């Protein structure tokens, strides 16, 4: 029989403290208030004093309310019925569908044993040239999208969700504005992609503690789908909101703050989520792509700074485009030698020419006279930005490579490209 405690020692915001024994860290409890029952989670143990984070917040909680410990950690339902559905950070439906209570699985478990993993060796096609051609997304990779506020990172995630060649999409939203939540819902529904998608959404108006549940729920469900043989892409936005929720709760708990007020375990908390990316030897895979906004466009901010040490590269979103010089996929060399024989050479030389174009723009802004070569670079840069960097471009990898050759042919002679003659002879457009 579960014990019921009817005396709350203290209430500090959404954190309550009770005296109890036989309780474990992370255990769920039910707090019965005059407004109804609310879940709470144990987040601190100090002798017989147990601190709990109340999901619905501390408003309406009084010291005489009952607290009943449930003897289990937070769980989420797993089945094919998740697809096409939308849930909040407590696992309850946000849509008009029924609550799912069968086949409950724990969240926040350990990452997969390395002996069960295989090396990343397959690409995920997205139809976005700046990803497929220049910074290939690889199965089981963990990548952040570094972005400033105001950049179209949610639009980019929605496009990837619609176009990525995977079996299942798990979309996790943390601190979303309600308009952004509706954008994801409506966009995926209209594109017919919601049927292969499960959404777990925490909006800015929801309790803070639910924000911390979103990544764990997404990754727990994704891992189960992967074990069942599915290739799963987990899309998370925004990990900075997740870190800010950690910071808020740490302050309430009076933890000693670290860099800019974030808790000292920020790195390990982020790593615990990203390390769930996996490619099983005899099953499916989990790939993680997560937006990390940079306050003030500051890449040294603790959240993007710590993230960079965990992940396998990054996409850097700037001025509405994936910036080629700030972006990097450290695993692309595992797959871009298997796509087409011109992939690597074309990728390297197009970026090299684009760097020369940027230098030419700087010379032009300083009033230098433009040479014939400079004029070619200016023409090339404009075509490269509109044909390759524009995020509205949606073409398969092979068509993107052909477009790359077409752009080169319109701006340069064969000899000026710097690409091996055998590749030029094979792929140079006829006219």
UniProtKB/Swiss-Prot annotation:
<keyword id="KW-0406">Ion transport</keyword>
<dbReference type="GO" id="GO:0046933">
    <property type="term" value="F:proton-transporting ATP synthase activity, rotational mechanism"/>
</dbReference>
<keyword id="KW-0813">Transport</keyword>
<comment type="function">
    <text>Produces ATP from ADP in the presence of a proton gradient across the membrane. The V-type beta chain is a regulatory subunit.</text>
</comment>
<dbReference type="InterPro" id="IPR000194">
    <property type="entry name" value="ATPase_F1/V1/A1_a/bsu_nucl-bd"/>
</dbReference>
<dbReference type="Pfam" id="PF02874">
    <property type="entry name" value="ATP-synt_ab_N"/>
</dbReference>
<keyword id="KW-0375">Hydrogen ion transport</keyword>
<dbReference type="InterPro" id="IPR055190">
    <property type="entry name" value="ATP-synt_VA_C"/>
</dbReference>
<keyword id="KW-0066">ATP synthesis</keyword>
<dbReference type="GO" id="GO:0042777">
    <property type="term" value="P:proton motive force-driven plasma membrane ATP synthesis"/>
</dbReference>
<dbReference type="InterPro" id="IPR004100">
    <property type="entry name" value="ATPase_F1/V1/A1_a/bsu_N"/>
</dbReference>
<dbReference type="Pfam" id="PF22919">
    <property type="entry name" value="ATP-synt_VA_C"/>
</dbReference>
<dbReference type="GO" id="GO:0005524">
    <property type="term" value="F:ATP binding"/>
</dbReference>
<dbReference type="Pfam" id="PF00006">
    <property type="entry name" value="ATP-synt_ab"/>
</dbReference>
<comment type="similarity">
    <text>Belongs to the ATPase alpha/beta chains family.</text>
</comment>
<protein>
    <recommendedName>
        <fullName>V-type ATP synthase beta chain</fullName>
    </recommendedName>
</protein>
<dbReference type="InterPro" id="IPR022879">
    <property type="entry name" value="V-ATPase_su_B/beta"/>
</dbReference>
<dbReference type="InterPro" id="IPR027417">
    <property type="entry name" value="P-loop_NTPase"/>
</dbReference>
């Amino acid at each position: 029989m579960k014990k019921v405690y009817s005396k709350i020692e203290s209430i500090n915001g959404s954190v309550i403290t009770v005296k109890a024994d036989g309780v474990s860290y992370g255990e769920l409890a039910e707090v019965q208030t005059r407004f109804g029952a609310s879940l709470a989670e144990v987040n601190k143990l100090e002798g017989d004093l147990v601190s709990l984070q109340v999901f619905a917040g501390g408003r309406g909680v009084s010291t005489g309310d009952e607290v009943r410990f449930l003897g289990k950690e937070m769980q989420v339902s797993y089945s094919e019925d998740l697809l096409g559905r939308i849930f909040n950070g407590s696992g309850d439906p946000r849509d008009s569908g029924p609550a799912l209570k069968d086949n409950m699985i724990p969240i926040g478990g350990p990452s997969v044993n390395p002996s069960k993993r295989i090396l990343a060796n397959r690409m995920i096609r997205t139809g976005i040239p700046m990803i497929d051609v220049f910074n290939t997304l690889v199965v089981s990779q963990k990548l952040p999208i570094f972005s400033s506020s105001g950049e179209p990172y949610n639009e980019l995630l929605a496009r990837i969700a619609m176009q990525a060649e995977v079996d299942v999409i798990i979309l996790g939203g943390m601190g979303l504005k309600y308009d952004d939540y509706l954008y994801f819902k409506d966009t995926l529904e209209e594109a017919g992609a919601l049927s292969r998608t499960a959404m777990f959404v925490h909006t800015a108006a929801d309790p803070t503690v639910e924000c911390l549940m979103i990544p764990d729920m997404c990754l727990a469900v994704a891992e189960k789908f992967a074990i069942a043989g599915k290739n799963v892409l987990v899309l998370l936005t925004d990990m900075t909101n997740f870190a800010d929720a950690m910071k808020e709760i740490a302050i309430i708990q009076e933890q000693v703050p670290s860099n800019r007020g974030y808790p000292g375990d920020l790195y390990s908390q982020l790593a615990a989520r990203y390390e769930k990316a996996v490619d099983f030897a005899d099953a499916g895979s989990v790939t993680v792509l997560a937006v990390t906004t940079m306050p003030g466009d500051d890449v040294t901010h603790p959240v993007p700074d710590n993230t960079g040490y965990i992940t396998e590269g990054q996409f850097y979103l700037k001025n509405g485009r994936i910036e080629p010089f700030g972006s990097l996929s450290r695993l692309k060399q595992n797959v871009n030698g298997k796509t087409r024989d011109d992939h690597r050479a074309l990728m390297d030389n197009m970026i090299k020419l684009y760097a020369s174009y940027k230098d030419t723009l700087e010379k032009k802004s300083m009033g230098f006279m433009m040479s014939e070569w400079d004029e070619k670079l200016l023409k090339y840069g404009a075509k490269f930005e509109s044909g390759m960097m524009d995020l509205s471009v949606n073409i398969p990898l092979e068509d993107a490579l052909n477009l790359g050759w077409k752009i080169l042919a319109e701006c340069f002679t064969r000899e000026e490209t710097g690409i091996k003659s055998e590749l030029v002879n094979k792929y140079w457009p006829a006219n």
